[in-house]
Swiss-Prot record:
Example GO BP: diterpenoid biosynthetic process
Gene coding for it: TPS14a
UniProt entry tagged with the keyword Lyase: yes
GO molecular function terms listed in the Swiss-Prot or TrEMBL record: magnesium ion binding; terpene synthase activity
Enzyme class at the top of the EC tree: lyase
Species in which this protein is naturally found: Solanum habrochaites
Designated name of the protein: Sesquiterpene synthase 14a
Details of cofactor binding: Binds 3 Mg(2+) or Mn(2+) ions per subunit.
Pfam families named among the record's database cross-references: Terpene_synth, Terpene_synth_C
Length: 554
């Protein structure tokens, strides 16, 4: 008899009855032999890469062709091969613009908007005043722009890099959405697909792997596409996909070793979805160790979340919280027997992390991981305490705690620890205590989760979400609470963009995980992580199952 079966059955538990795994042992079939990259594939990739590099070198920086080429390379998911060249080119484009901006009379909306997005995407502040020439005396965008579909599409994409106070970009967003929606049915198939995908999920708030997978199909159907670029993008995606399949196979074996079904039947079986999150943060070949560590962490977070949220009693959670804070094997005897397997996984996770970091001379990084872990586990207990005492807190009090329970900052700090780069003490302290991007990413995660999971959670005993807190505090309707949550999410994105543009003392590799974590949450439809049988299943299939050479890309 397993330990859960021996737990007192008279205890009332708020069981969530989650569905079984969508994937099961599916990825075990991807053996090392099946997922090995052949020497011919490696050689062909290098040859194509050199040809694309030559295209970048030979195309003048201050030309429309260079902007389009960089944009295409980024969308196809192969920009990571040419980071330095792209960085230098965009710097040159920005410097040339700054030098001549008073003389700049470019009336091509497509070019102005594309340049704006690419320049801001490389963390250079270009003023949104570049768009005033496309407005009338009353500040409204000119109706003649509605004839320029590509211009509207590029302007729409550019608006998602806005910061606080940029009213012209707020107006541009409304203007472009209205007109792109109305004209979409009349467009040719290629342009219609681009508009439809952009309205569904703009580039800036989408994860790069999903952008690449879908754009390969769109680009293939553009008559003027470059065959060499397309071939390179497909081969690169294919090679990375095989690497991801191999990693999923290894992690599935680890998952089976944990004996999930017997030891954690109260929790969601989400190994593959957790790996999807890790890949959304770091997809490149140099981040294998980071993906493995992040996947294990997100698995631990998921099981712990379900333990606190959908199984354990408050009296069981108090000693468990204390044990996690102590992070010592001697705390094992103080917790309920059925909790011990999870606690052991937690201890093993930190032991493994410490050993790996010690090899790299970075053992002191674990200190930051443990600080964030302690904040996180205590915030769970606070939530359980509110539930036990039927407390619906004020919105600000709720957010202070709930932006910790959502675990974004703990994941973010772990990203920095395992990325393989040197991170100074000052950078850790800035990210934890001073940044806008970390709390903004946490808030997006929290509020999006509360919006999409609200109805599902009402089916059982559950702690208050932002929706309940707002309704009670402001005597508002649920619909008004949803509107407020979405407003705060939009503002949080502006905070992320602000740090990305202005926190120039912080390297880009430090900020990108927070940006990608926010993107991962933003793409979720309904309660996709919990009920991953629909949109998320299709997305995972696109990335890790379907061949990029197949005719259908979703």
């Amino acid at each position: 008899m397993n330990q859960l079966a021996m737990v007192n059955t008279t205890i009332t538990r708020p069981l969530a009855n989650y569905h079984s795994s969508v994937w099961g042992n599916y990825f075990l079939s991807y053996t090392p032999q099946l997922t090995e990259t052949s020497s011919q594939e490696k050689r062909e990739l290098e040859e194509l890469k050199e040809k694309v590099r030559q295209m970048l070198v030979e195309t003048p920086d201050n030309s429309t062709q260079k902007l389009v080429l960089i944009d295409t390379i980024q969308r196809l998911g192969v920009a990571y091969h040419f980071e330095n060249h792209i960085k230098i080119s965009i710097q040159n484009i920005f410097d040339e613009f700054e030098k001549n901006k008073n003389k700049d009379n470019d009336d091509d909306l497509c070019v102005v908007a594309l340049r704006f997005r690419l320049v801001r995407g490389q963390r250079h502040y270009m003023s949104s005043d570049v768009f005033t020439r496309f407005t009338n005396d009353d500040g409204k965008f000119k109706e003649t722009l509605t004839k320029d579909v590509s211009g509207l599409l590029n302007l729409y994409e550019a608006t998602h890099l806005r910061v606080h106070g940029e009213e012209i970009l707020e107006d541009a967003l409304s203007f472009t959405v209205t007109h792109l929606k109305s004209m979409s049915p009349k467009l040719d198939n290629s342009l219609k697909a681009q508009v439809s995908e952009a309205l569904f999920q703009p580039i800036h708030t989408n994860i790069p792997r999903v952008v690449a997978r879908k754009y390969i199909r769109i680009y293939e159907n553009i008559e003027s596409h470059d065959d060499l670029l397309l071939k390179f993008a497909k081969l690169d995606f294919h090679i990375l996909q095989k690497m991801h399949q191999r990693e999923l196979s290894e992690l599935t074996r680890w998952w089976k070793y944990l004996d999930y079904e017997n030891k954690y039947p109260y929790a969601r079986d989400k190994l593959v979805e957790c790996y999807f999150w890790a890949t959304g943060v770091y997809f490149g070949p140099q981040y294998k160790r980071a993906r493995k560590t992040l996947t294990k962490l997100i698995v631990i977070i998921t099981i712990t979340d379900d333990l606190y949220d959908a199984y354990a009693t408050y009296d069981e959670l108090v000693p468990y919280t204390d044990a996690v804070e102590r992070c010592e094997i001697s705390a094992m005897h103080s917790i309920s027997p059925y909790m011990r397997p999870l606690y052991q996984v937690f201890l093993d996770y930190f032991d493994e992390m410490e050993k790996e970091l010690t090899k790299d001379g970075k053992a002191h990084y674990v200190y930051y991981a443990k600080i964030e872990t302690n904040k996180w586990i205590k915030s769970y207990l606070k939530e359980a305490e509110w539930l036990k005492n039927d407390i619906i807190p004020k919105c600000e009090e709720y957010k202070r705690n709930a932006t910790i329970t959502v675990s974004s900052q703990m994941i973010l700090i772990t990203c920095l620890i395992v990325a393989g780069e040197f991170i100074s003490k000052e950078t850790f302290e800035w990210m934890i205590n001073e940044s806008l991007i970390a709390p903004a990413s946490s808030l997006i995660n929290r509020l999006k989760d509360d919006i999409i999971g609200h109805e599902h959670e009402q089916q059982r005993e559950h702690g208050a979400s932002f929706i309940e807190c707002y309704v009670k505090e402001y005597r508002a309707s649920k619909q008004e609470a949803y509107v407020e949550a979405r407003r705060q999410i939009a503002n949080a994105w502006k905070d992320i963009n602000t740090d990305y543009l202005h926190a120039t003392q912080v390297p880009t590799f430090v900020l990108e995980p927070a940006l990608n974590l926010s993107r991962l949450v933003d793409i979720l439809q309904e309660d996709d992580f919990t009920d991953s049988q629909n949109f998320l299943k299709d997305t995972i299939t696109l990335l890790f199952v379907d061949s990029v050479n197949s005719t259908s890309c979703g």
